[in-house]
Amino acid sequence: MLKVMLVDDEPYTLQGLQVIIDWESGGFEIAAVCSNGKEALKYLADNQVDLIISDIKMPEMNGLELLETIKREKISDAAFVLLTGYDDFQYTQRAIRNGCLDYIL
């Protein structure tokens, strides 16, 4: 099974992602649930995942900062997807420049 990390500061969003999607039937398992980028980096220091799905706007470290840190410091080669309500093209450009696989509004 492929390991997935969910990163979002909204508990209802995290809960919804875990319950609504049938991860197992797609060959995925939720390996970690983090409420901000710093928590995600802490988890990734000792663990590997195959896919990171992250919100953009979060306290302490946002999703774009998380993506940039992971790529710059070569912390993980996991596919990275941003799931957000921000439709600002600058966010999209910044995400793509840093290797974001997908940007879901």
Language model segments and positions:
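Active-site residues of response regulator receiver
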Residues: 8, 55
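Two-component/phosphorelay signaling modules centered on CheY-like receiver
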Residues: 11-32
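Acidic, metal-coordinating helix/loop segments flanking the phosphotransfer/catalytic sites
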Residues: 18, 33-51
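Short hydrophobic/Thr-rich beta-strand motif most characteristic of the beta2 strand and flanking loop
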Residues: 25-35, 43, 92
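Acidic catalytic/metal-coordinating carboxylates
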Residues: 36-39, 62-65, 84
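Short amphipathic alpha-helix used as the core "switch/output" element in two-component signaling
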Residues: 42, 64-75
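Receiver (REC) domain active-site loop signature in two-component systems and cognate sites
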Residues: 58
